[in-house]
């Protein structure tokens, strides 16, 4: 392949050189003998000789011209002879076996050319405007190296996927895609070296924001049972009344090292849940937790809830880049799934866990395997869960592999295991390895012993740009199953989120429609009383961190869906309408629950660096075991975010 590429390059070079010589006029022939210099002994001045018309007379070498020689002559103009134009040289944008070298735009900067990148960078938070922009480019048929189901992305991996698609975007007739590309590259400008100089130190405030959220009416804040009025919000506190948060984030990058801190002050007023005793009794029976409870529990919002005024680290981690991996420690976002409204395995519905992460941030080609499955990315993390009482202090680890066999299709396998806990099994290297590698069914005596491999949840997902309409329609599926090797092996027992996105409505190209349906209540006898998906018999608070489901907000034994209609004003501005519906099974929550939400959202920029995000939501919900009749609440939110430019310097020579 390399020899063929070298021969192709040499042939192109020879062709270009021969064409250049063919278009260069021939020089006049040199005289056979130069006349002697007048200063030499016996030399005489040269005598001019007549020349044919249409040629240039020769000038004597080093001779002193006489006045007669200095008289101007007017030769006839020379008419250039047209040279035949060679065939155009077309180099493909992507390597092929016939042409292994990809094309670059004219005068391409160095950073566009592929090469080894040893520098590290911080992750972009999953609630950033960057992800809707990247997703829109992906669903328009660009960003062939984007892994939709594995978020977040680092700043540099985002830059690489954008540069890999730059020529396709720039040479397309899609002006909206070009605008999105320009805004994203401006966001990442600190990562882009100038000329041949590598990026040096990058530091500064990444964002600063304040949010005012007023809620009028009774709310739901019970992720593990009845439902949530506010979801996918990092498990932040909220109650009826005025809720306020203000925060900032900082980024520091130098060579392979990076540091990111995002902290915020949060305020939520006091509230009262007042779950009736019959409801608490039934929920505790289904959860297999003794009632009355020994003390406050995060999964049961009961009694008077005090006002909350914490300062909390939303994200905080240090990382080092090693051979295409980010190895990090701390609190980092995770959104493992292709869905827009939720992710079955991991989302930002709950507070992030403190964990050790190993993330392959750049696609990896594995010999032989990648010929069949395409480039692969993988992610692993392990950390401790908080807010658990039965059992206290369990740990969790997650492993994911995602493949792209074609530019239109991505699929992934993921596995989460919750193991250990006070009084059950110690968290040691031995118990970790046992939980990591064990895929066998677990008998009751083993489950309740120190050899318990843990609660195992397996996920399978894919995204597919549909044939013939790949620039318009994207199909996604995300599934999870409890105690199965993979949802593919037991599809009837799995929970699903599936949907379709229409990126451009015919006649209104900036209008986008997205619909997703979700269920955690499969039609099997095992799904009863909430004791299946997101639940576990040993770690009884199940798939939660500080009381909130870590996966999809739909929760346990429920069905629902979401729909979004979005009009894109620009690359980072939009108007969006959303509808949400959820129904919880009656055998889990007595009488069941029903939620309907209608939401209008506007994201607008003032200048380049100030973003306004304002939205209004109406919710009507029914939970007869909690409150009789239809309950209504309205939420109005205004958030201002400032995105200052990071300071950056070139690397030292």
What are these regions, as identified by a protein language model?
Residues 8-19:
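Bacterial N-terminal signal peptides
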Residues 21-240, 249-255, 652-653:
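N-terminal periplasmic/intermembrane-space "pro-region" immediately following the signal or transit peptide
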Residues 120-123, 146-149, 170-176, 252-256, ...:
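Short loop/turn motifs that connect adjacent beta-strands in outer-membrane beta-barrel proteins
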Residues 251-292, 406-408:
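Carboxylate/His-rich catalytic cores and anion/metal-binding grooves
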Residues 256-257, 304-365:
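A conserved hydrophobic secondary-structure block that centers on an alpha-helix together
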Residues 281-319, 342-346, 423-429, 433-458:
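Outer-membrane beta-barrel transmembrane domain signature of Gram-negative proteins
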Residues 334-335, 353-543, 556-563, 568, ...:
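Signature for the C-terminal beta-barrel architecture of outer-membrane proteins
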Residues 401, 604, 615, 632-653:
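Outer-membrane beta-barrel "beta-signal"
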């Amino acid at each position: 392949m390399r020899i063929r590429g070298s021969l192709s390059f040499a042939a192109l070079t020879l062709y270009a050189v021969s064409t250049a010589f063919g278009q260069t006029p021939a020089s006049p022939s040199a005289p056979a003998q130069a006349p002697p210099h007048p200063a030499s002994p016996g030399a005489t001045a040269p005598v001019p000789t007549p020349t044919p018309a249409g040629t240039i007379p020769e000038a004597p070498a080093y001779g002193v011209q006489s006045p007669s020689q200095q008289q101007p002559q007017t030769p006839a103009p020379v008419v250039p002879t047209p040279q035949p134009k060679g065939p155009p040289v077309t180099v493909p944008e992507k390597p092929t076996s016939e042409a292994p070298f990809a094309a670059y735009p004219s005068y391409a900067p160095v950073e566009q050319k592929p090469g080894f990148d040893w520098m590290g960078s911080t992750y972009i938070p999953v609630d950033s405007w960057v992800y809707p922009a990247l997703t829109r480019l992906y669903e328009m048929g660009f960003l062939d190296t984007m892994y939709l189901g594995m978020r977040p992305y680092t700043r540099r991996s985002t830059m690489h996927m954008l540069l890999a698609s730059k020529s396709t975007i720039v040479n397309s007739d899609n002006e909206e895609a070009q605008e999105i590309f320009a805004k994203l590259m401006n966001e990442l400008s600190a990562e882009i070296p100038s000329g041949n100089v590598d990026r040096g130190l990058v530091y500064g405030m990444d964002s600063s924001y304040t949010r005012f959220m007023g809620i009028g009416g009774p709310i739901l804040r019970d992720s593990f049972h009845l439902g949530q009025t506010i979801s996918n919000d990092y498990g932040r506190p909220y109650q009826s009344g005025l809720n306020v948060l203000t925060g900032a984030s900082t980024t520091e990058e130098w060579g392979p090292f990076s540091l990111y801190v995002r902290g915020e002050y949060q305020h939520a007023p006091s509230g009262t849940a007042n779950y009736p005793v019959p409801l608490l009794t039934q929920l505790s029976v289904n959860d297999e937790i003794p009632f009355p409870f020994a003390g406050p529990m995060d999964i049961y919002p009961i009694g008077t809830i005090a006002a909350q005024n914490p300062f909390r680290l939303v994200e905080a981690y240090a990382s080092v880049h090693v051979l295409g991996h980010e190895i990090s420690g701390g609190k980092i976002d995770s959104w493992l799934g292709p869905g827009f409204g939720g992710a079955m395995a991991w989302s930002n519905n709950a507070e992030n866990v403190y964990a050790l992460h190993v993330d392959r941030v750049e696609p990896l080609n594995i010999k032989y395997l990648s010929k069949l499955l395409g480039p692969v990315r993988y992610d692993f993390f392990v950390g401790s869960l908080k807010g658990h009482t039965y059992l206290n202090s369990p740990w969790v680890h997650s492993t994911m592999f995602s493949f792209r066999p074609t530019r239109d299709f991505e699929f992934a396998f993921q596995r989460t295991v919750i193991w250990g806990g006070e009084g059950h099994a110690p968290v040691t290297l031995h118990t970790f390895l046992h939980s990591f590698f064990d895929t066998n069914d677990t008998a009751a005596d083993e489950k309740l012993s120190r050899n318990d491999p843990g609660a195992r949840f397996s996920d399978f997902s894919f995204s597919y740009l549909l044939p013939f309409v790949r620039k318009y329609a994207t199909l996604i599926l995300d599934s999870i199953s409890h105690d199965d090797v993979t949802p593919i092996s037991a599809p009837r027992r799995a929970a699903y989120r599936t949907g379709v996105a229409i990126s451009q409505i015919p006649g209104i190209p900036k209008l986008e429609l997205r619909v997703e349906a979700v269920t955690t209540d499969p039609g099997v006898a095992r799904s009863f009383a909430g004791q299946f998906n997101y639940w576990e018999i040993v770690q009884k608070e199940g798939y939660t961190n500080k009381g909130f489901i870590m996966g999809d907000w739909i929760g346990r034994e429920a069905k629902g869906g979401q729909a979004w209609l979005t009009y894109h004003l620009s690359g980072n501005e939009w108007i969006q309408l959303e509808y949400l519906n959820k129904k919880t099974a009656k055998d889990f929550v007595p009488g069941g629950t029903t939620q309907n939400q209608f939401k209008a959202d506007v994201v607008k920029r003032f200048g380049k660096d100030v973003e306004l995000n304002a939205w209004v939501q109406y919710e009507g919900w029914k939970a007869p075991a909690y409150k009789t009749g239809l309950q209504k609440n309205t939420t109005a939110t205004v958030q201002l975010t400032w995105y200052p430019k990071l300071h950056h310097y070139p690397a030292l020579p």
